A protein has these predicted regions:
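C-terminal transmembrane helical hairpin of 12-TM major facilitator-type secondary transporters
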Residues: 295, 301-344
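C-terminal membrane-cytosol helix-exit motif in multi-pass small-molecule transporters
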Residues: 166-167, 171, 189-214, 399-403
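Intracellular juxtamembrane helix-capping segments at the cytosolic ends
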Residues: 44, 126-139, 338-352
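A late C-terminal transmembrane helix in Major Facilitator Superfamily
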Residues: 351-380
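Helix-loop boundary and gating motifs at the non-cytosolic
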Residues: 13-69, 239-244, 253-263, 269
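C-terminal ends and interior cores of transmembrane alpha-helices
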Residues: 93-108, 310-321
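Hydrophobic core of transmembrane alpha-helices in multi-pass small-molecule transporters
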Residues: 31, 111-126, 325-339
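Helix-to-loop junctions at the C-terminal end of transmembrane segments
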Residues: 71-84, 286-300, 377
């Protein structure tokens, strides 16, 4: 009688801690990118005022959103064909060039050149913000929420660290003979160039290897045939996920941009308005280490339902006439966006062909939200804007009904 050899047990999936040692260049590059946008694009309206075009102060933000919407699908295709490292590296290089153009245009008083730089930096955002999919693909499915949460935490750390470098930027501005809002574009260009170096050091781990199964070494972070865009959209829950992501982005950007103006009209000082923005950023990014594991543990429906409820609360409390009410609105607005963004990213990590188009639609929603939201507020008042935002906040509940997992 012969005894069949015992098959060796399959290797255990690697832990997140072991995988994080390979993800640090990706995380650090995202922190650098967030720091770059903190010192550049956020102050674009001030640069336009310096250039004598205060009536067009919102144009750079619109160009940034539109450029990101137009580029996201193209970067998604590039990453599918050539891999995450090449796609993200190209985005960081493009962003660095955009920062240099923006600095040159602002310093020499060339408004078209400055706007070209803003558009270039916006197009880069359409690419490098897809780093979240790379992070999710690099770890096993049960800890993808955690991987995404860490990425969000690194984003807010990058923003906060750069805020602390204000005195150094002021000193550099003095040596260059420019304002801080102009020098920020040069600093941002340098940070994005450094992010490109970080991505060059990154060695993506194939998805199958991240899950603990054998795979060939490639830069695609995927193995086997990938579903096409049509096949991805036909899968249950994908279209509703894209709709939820776009709605959350539109609601977040619109209610983030317009309440500070309303707070100013209420008589709040700049310090109080800055506190509103800080509370919003904390809600967006600071709780990633909590919300990511919660989504892993409680499921995708939890993320969509809780995110939708928080967006509804944000819309409802945004009409308040008190600072406390506005602070609550801005905070839960950020936290609701956090939950929906993490959940949507976890879903779309299984459908690479849909990632670029999803981000394009989200950026387009943000651009339309700020443009049409301002017109609606001027014509019908802020309550009408809040009501519209509340209606859009219902889309995540559709995604919760359709999603699997």
């Amino acid at each position: 009688m012969t005894v069949s050899p015992v098959s060796p047990a399959p290797p255990a999936p690697p832990t997140f801690a072991s995988l994080a040692t390979r993800l640090w260049p990706l995380y650090l590059s995202q922190a650098l990118a967030t720091g770059a946008t903190t010192v550049s694009t956020i102050l674009a309206s001030l640069v336009m005022a310096d250039l004598g075009s205060e009536q067009l102060s919102g144009l750079p933000s619109t160009l940034i959103s539109l450029a990101a919407a137009l580029s996201a699908s193209s970067f998604g295709v590039l990453m599918l064909r050539r891999g995450r490292r090449i796609g993200l590296g190209s985005a960081f290089v493009l962003g660095s060039l955009g920062g240099l153009l923006g600095f040159a245009g602002a310093r020499w008083g060339l408004t078209p050149l400055f706007l070209a730089g803003a558009a270039g930096l916006g197009a880069a955002q359409g690419g490098f913000q897809q780093a979240r999919y790379a992070a999710a693909e690099s770890v096993p499915a049960p800890v993808r929420g955690l991987a995404l949460g860490v990425l969000m935490l690194m984003s807010v750390l990058g923003s906060w660290v750069m805020t602390g470098f204000g005195p150094q930027i002021t000193a550099l501005s003095g040596r260059l003979g420019t304002g801080e809002e102009v020098t920020g574009w040069l600093v941002g260009a340098g940070l994005l160039a450094l992010a490109a170096v970080m991505i060059a050091l990154w060695r993506p781990l194939p998805a199958a290897s991240a899950a603990g199964t054998p795979a060939s070494n490639s830069d695609t972070s995927q193995t086997g045939a990938k579903p096409s865009l049509a096949e991805s959209l036909a899968a249950p829950g994908v279209k509703s996920t894209i709709a939820a992501l776009a709605a959350a982005q539109a609601v977040m950007v619109t209610l983030m941009s317009l309440p500070p103006l309303r707070a100013h009209h209420m008589g709040l000082e700049h310090g109080s308005i800055a506190g509103l923005v800080s509370g919003h950023i904390a809600g967006m990014f600071a709780f990633g280490l909590l919300t990511g594991p919660l989504i892993d543990r409680l499921g995708l429906r939890f993320g969509y339902v809780m995110g939708g409820l928080l967006l509804l609360l944000a819309a409802g409390t945004s009409v308040t006439g008190t600072r406390a009410g506005l602070l609550l609105s801005m905070f839960v607005l950020g936290l609701g966006w956090n939950l929906i963004s993490l959940t949507s990213s976890k879903v779309l990590s299984r459908w690479p062909a849909a990632q670029g188009p999803a981000d394009s639609l989200a950026f387009a929603g943000a651009a339309l939200g700020t443009l049409l939201g301002g017109l609606l507020m001027a014509r019908s008042g802020f309550p009408a804007l809040a009501l519209t935002a509340g209606m859009l906040a219902l889309l995540p509940f559709w995604a919760a009904w359709r999603v699997r997992g």
